[in-house]
Structure formats: C-alpha cells, structure tokens
Amino acid sequence: MKILECSSKGDKRFSAFYARVSIKGVEKSIECWYQYAKRDEYGRVPGKGKRVNHMVNPFNGHKLPAACLSDFYTCLWIRYFTTHPDLLEYAKGFDEFNDIFRGKCINCQADIIRACVKDFIGLKNKVMTSEFYKDCKGK
C-alpha cells in the first residue's frame, strides 16, 4: 500500500503550508489564505485556538458564516490542482493519504486531497453549489 504524507513532514507539494495559489493576483500558501479568511466577533484574525465567528471572502471581501470555511478550503485545493494537474495525476498513484496533524483542526488536507483524487470533477461541482462559491459569483 502506497501512502502519501500530505503535510510539511511529507511531500511538501501536498502541504497547505507550501502549496501556493493566487487570488486576485496575490500568491500565498493555502494555509495562509485559509487562516487569513478567519475572523473573530470583532472582525480581526483570531489567535491560535480562538473562536472563529465568521469568514471574509478574499475574492470579494464579503462577510460569510464560519461554516463556509470548509468550502473555501476545498476551493483553494481545487485551484491548486487546476493549476498543477500533474500533481493530481501523481497523487492518483497512491492508495491512502495521511496527515500527521489530522484532528487538530476541522479541515484536513489529506482528506481534501483524497477527495480530489477520487472525484475531482464531482468535488468541484459540489463546491460550485456552495454558499461560498455563490457569493464569489454574486448570486
């Protein structure tokens, strides 16, 4: 069984700390975009372990419920694999996906990468029906 370690302790191309995407011409790591979108009740980026009240959509600056963060995180990985289809193909050569940091937060990069490998188009279509994506499109 081939296992892909999806963290900074494994193949860094599959780590949210190293995988980079552009939003409105600004390139940052997936982790940076994700953390920057989180806000506390005062609209500030919350400190580590602090409660997230809502998110700010970096595509348009709109305030969205914190529940949209998972779809945003998935969207970031979809953007990454859309610009790096060779990495998605490479990941298809693995049977399992692990993240040694799994369980420390609600979103797990290994789970998202596994979902992308299993059904990239289906996952992309699911995100396109989400509240987060509809907000991006102004609907």
Model-derived regions, located:
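N-terminal accessory segments that precede or flank the first globular/catalytic domain
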Residues: 1-35
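Active-site nucleophilic cysteine motif
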Residues: 102-116
